[in-house]
Amino acid sequence: MKQLLLQAFNLIRQNPFYATISIIGTAVTIAFVMVVVMIYDFRTMDMAPESDRSDMMYTGSGMTYRKLDHTNQNSGMGRKAFEALFSELPGVKEVTWYRGVSKTPCNLSASNEIFNYYVRPVADNWFKFFDYEFIAGRSFTQEEYDARRWVSVITERMALQLFGTTDVVGKEYQSNFFPTKVVGVVKDVNAIFQTAYADAFVPFSLENEDYYATWTGGLGGIRLGLLKLLPDTRPAEVRTEVQHRQDRLNSSTAEYAFEMNELYTHTEYTFFRGKDISAPLVYSMLLMVLLIVPAINISGMTNARMQERVT
């Protein structure tokens, strides 16, 4: 060990430039690898409220178009298409749906101060699908959901900022100028949970879903789906079954057809969603970065040996 340290010290003294590059490069590479691993773990490992990330699949928006000439294309999935493709899928434990978050003005009726919060419309089984920690109250009931009542589950941060306390079950606030009753309060959700995150959750039934389906033969809409797979189910099997169902659906429709070509695992949805991001390209770039430092080290060592022979 002592001899190795002496050799390293002599190498640094004889070739300070290459030694400095080698040390800095090695340190940067180690730090880079640690950051990549940490980001990957935080974004993909099973953590509450997204406790089943490894078993989840995400749908895209899908697309409707006129069969005759592929015109009148619109993105978005409606109730009819969603139920035809994803209801009672073999190998799927549970299915839910939602709409993306939107920044919504919220305030108390007795106050002129308006706050903007991220509000997410969700299905009636949303709080069974994810593991939120309730501080007070409950999720909205099936009756409230079906009756399209203006109720919401809000986060601790929103409750404290809006009301000054978390004891707010039964109280009302204005959500986009609609009186909304608080039925539950959950622990804050970090934005790293891209699907479970929101400041407030309201029933998806409040959305005028049928309006979006009127000009697409009932197929179009605003739903995004989530599937929770059984342990032995492979994503490829689900994709194959969904494709078969899609073919059957389109063979039974008159004017419009629906396409769902976007079914992601959690890792795919998090890092490689969309056609602009190529997984092979990302992996190749990471590999190149990891190989640069060893290449510099070898180059420095070779140059040092050559200088020794010359002298």
Regions found by a protein language model. Give the residues of each.
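Mid-to-C-terminal secondary-structure elements
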Residues: 123-139, 150-274
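Internal alpha-helical transmembrane segments of multipass membrane proteins
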Residues: 281-301
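The feature marks short, hydrophobic/small-residue-biased sequence motifs that occur predominantly
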Residues: 99, 108-146
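Membrane-helix entry/capping segments
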Residues: 1-3, 10, 14, 247-287, ...
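Intracellular coupling helices
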Residues: 5-17, 21, 296-311
